Amino acid sequence: MKDMDCIPGPKPLPVVGNLFDLDLDNALQSIIRMADEFGPLFQITINGQKQIFATSQALVDELCDETRFHKAVMGGVEKLRMLAQDGLFTAHHGERGWGIAHRILMPAFGPLRIRDMFEDMSDVAHQLCFKWARQGSSASINIAEDFTRLTLDTIALCTMSFRLNSYYNSETMHPFVQSMLYVLKEADLQATLPGVANCVRVKAQRRMSKHIQAMRNIAGDIIKGRRDKPEPVDDLLNTLLNGRDPVTGEGMSDELIISNIITFLVAGHETTSGLLSFTFYYLLQHPHVLEQARNEVDEVVGVGPITVQHLAKLPYIDAVMKESLRLMPTAPAFTVTPKKPEVVGGKWMVNTGQSVHVLLPVCLRDEAVFGPDAGEFRPTRMLEENFSKLPPNSWKPFGNGERGCIGRAFAWQEAQLVVASVLQTFDLVAEDPYYKLRIKETLTIKPDGFRVRATLRRGQSATALSQHNMSAGATASPGSSTHLAGDENGQDTAGGQPISFFYGSNSGTCKALAHRLASTMMTRGFTDQHLAQLDSAVDNLPRDQPTIIVTTTYDGQPTDDAKKFLAWLESGNVPSLHGVSYAVFGCGHQDWTKTFYRIPILIDDLMHKAGATRLTTRGTANAAVSDLFSDLEVWEETNLLPALREKFYLCNSSDFEPLDPHQLQISISKPARVGMHRDLVEGKVTAIRTLTSPGVPEKRHVEFQIPSEMALRPGDHVNILPVNPPCSVLRALARFSLASDHSITFESSNALDLPQATPVSAAELFSSYLELSQPATRINLKSLASATPSDDDKKELLHFHDSYDSLIRDKRVSVLDLLEHFTSITLPIATFISMLPVLRVRTYSLSMAPSFKPLHCSLTFSVVNEPAWSGNGRYLGVGSNYLASLTPGSILYVSPRPAKDAFHLPTDQSSNPIIMICAGSGLAPFRSFIQDRMAWLQQGKPLAKALLFFGCRGPHLDDLYHDELSEFESAGVVEVRRAYSKVPNHYLAKGCRYAQHRLLTETETIQDMWAHNATLYLCGSANLAKGVKAVLENMLGTLSEERYITEIF
């Protein structure tokens, strides 16, 4: 053997080793800095022990080979054995208690069991959202602390049906958390200090023991509470108490149960809260990523409840979380030791008993894998098409192999739900825009001192949010109510055509899939069924009937109940399987790229090699991105059933017959409210996205299909028929003590244009027919004054009448506002309805040229959600909040409204220059102008010069359609001149805050274009119009209405 290289590292001192090379408050950061100096493998001496650190993907790939290395418990983890003893995380390799607990608990963390926990996860996520909403947008939120509360409450509720209610005590953390934080910090410190130093820290040792005992007492109380009051729930706690090891038949001792309860409460929340905290830190540092993530949630979920099915449809959220965990792995290391002396990296010897720490914060930034920008936050590298191409063991934040995190699927589902819920509900901004990331270290890491502010989106109030069911929770698992044909002991059902099902399943998922398939096959004529574990098929595969195998891979190996079967197939002693007809359905998870579908593929190939006949191609289901039951059903319909028909003469009559559509007669008609307005047609939303970053007034883009008969030109308007914001509807219902489904019938509505003699639900009436936000009239004020018995209230209402313009009209105070303020008013609902006008259409400028995308239309709008001028609550724009609530597939009702003739493009765009001036969403009509010019250019026609002056707050804030306009500029369609009110010194703004100022920088160009018969267009506020007109008149003289055309909003 060639000479081995010495493992490099800083020179240790006697007794203290490398203690003085470490910042004890930030030991991890000290070690990370050493990696830059000493390379991919280095060692230091701590507490009298040499500790080796690996920092490259190539080394990690070696160290993750479980045939050569296994987990080592040392350092801070070893110190935690005082707390968690032989629990799943702290047990030594091969420790008997670990094996018993692991085999009992694995099924409790299978994909189906995790899906069933979704409703409880949603419950706690709602509590977080409600807390933030009720605190208001000015509250300073310590995001790491609140996520700690969330994750602790979630693990306790989902696994033990135990409510810690951390959000109901905002001043202090739960005692378990207080003790846990001390123990984690102290364990980390003790692992760093020399043994002699720990011996003299008597008070610290006593305090450590006190906190450990407190945590074990809490776990013991949980056990006692369940035993005193047993609950018939299929949760982790009952599994701990009643489960039996399938190998030894033993249950867990109380001490082992306590150790694992502590393990789950600590490991189940500490790292996940860090993941969430870092994820939102990176999102707020990268507004374009935040926008894309928020848009994905809006497009997939909209404003409705988040369901478990939505999570697999959020690939960008998934990539954001993976990238956050890559840069900041919250459990920053795992440790292995060789089974025998091993050479790693081709030149370093690691002896038995030596431990190697995989230093994840460095390994996961390996430029050899992730490129020169490995230190940058770029979620696209974690999208599936890129993630699947990474070298093996490039992304290991959940540890490795059989000692990897058992609760990974739980943590990931929880984190996906919380990220989606927060993005759906809030706009977040960092409290300190100049915050520099600091790391708080225990045995895990979190951001230190990172605080945010949260503002409810779409104008919701905290009350409305709490009354709105944000999530329907988990739907019943597709397999949860399935009749089980046979059982794990291999019992049969008699009669009909025979079929056998064999499954390999550790967590229960493949078993449930096999049962589901057996149940559906029962309806197709295969009523003589045998269903059992795969190991029972050794020398026992049936012939002359179909055999269906459902299995998966566990850490690259077969499941416990399939090991004998695979060994039999691999032994070479398998008799000919001629006459065996089989099909394999395999499950897997794409994150384990090296072993993805390994066992199903191997079983399929070995059976075929032994002479068995494949009925059909192998089916697969990827638990990371799809619903396993849906994938099984697709495979059954498209592959398995056709093969069974051909091979076993399964006739179509035995197939499952779907409901005959003629048995259910329905008709669909347009809403009655549509008939109250002229010329409304149906549009279907195809896209909606947010155009601005958090912290600035929200602007949105909505695009929808329109029928061919709806004629529009660039510059035209579109009427939309809105509904009132849900929070306004809830306010009205509450004021009149109505349920949303109370029925109201108008026997006579006099002059009101409301449905006659047709029941309307109270919610629909307030939502779709009446203007709830319309300012009260003077007559309304008199009517309300006459309806109150309170002299003081009457006097105040009459004062409002006398000062109507300043106190009511200008502050937009509605009748509903007044009814909520003056609770003494007794007003019949009929009187209230008669006071309100019928809900009217809202008008928006067209922001898409019909020539650019035929039969489509888009609107660009500001979402009006601001403090009410009355000083009470918030004012929500009816039309804009309605549009903001739409999602792709939504139906809305629209009609065209032509602009004035002058506010259209010149007939001859080749010879007539145009100058467009706008700010904010005033860009809308000019976007349609520019797109139409692009279509003109694409027809080979020349274009006269066009200038666009656009004012906004700044780049990456609300610079609407920036990339799109840049493309039009490059094509020669338009030249854009920007003004940024927040950053006027930006190179694009040329020192200008507002569009009128930007005009002055182009005086000569404007004058030249004016001399060549240019037309000037303006779209914006009255203030903008006033400032622009003053500049232009000084520059050009008198402006004629034929060549200076304005739209003021």
Curated annotation (Swiss-Prot):
Heme binds at C405. It comes from the Eukaryota. Residues 678-906 form the FAD-binding FR-type domain. It holds the Pfam family FAD_binding_1. GO terms for molecular function: aromatase activity; flavin adenine dinucleotide binding; FMN binding; heme binding; iron ion binding; NADPH-hemoprotein reductase activity. Its cofactor is FAD; FMN; heme. Binds 1 FAD. Binds 1 FMN. Keywords: Electron transport, FAD, Flavoprotein, FMN, Heme, Iron, Metal-binding, Monooxygenase, NADP, Oxidoreductase, Transport. FMN binds at residues 505-509, 584-616. The keyword Lyase does not apply. This is Self-sufficient cytochrome P450 monooxygenase CYP505E4. It comes from Penicillium camemberti (strain FM 013). The lineage of its organism: Eukaryota, Fungi, Dikarya, Ascomycota, Pezizomycotina. The gene is CYP505E4.
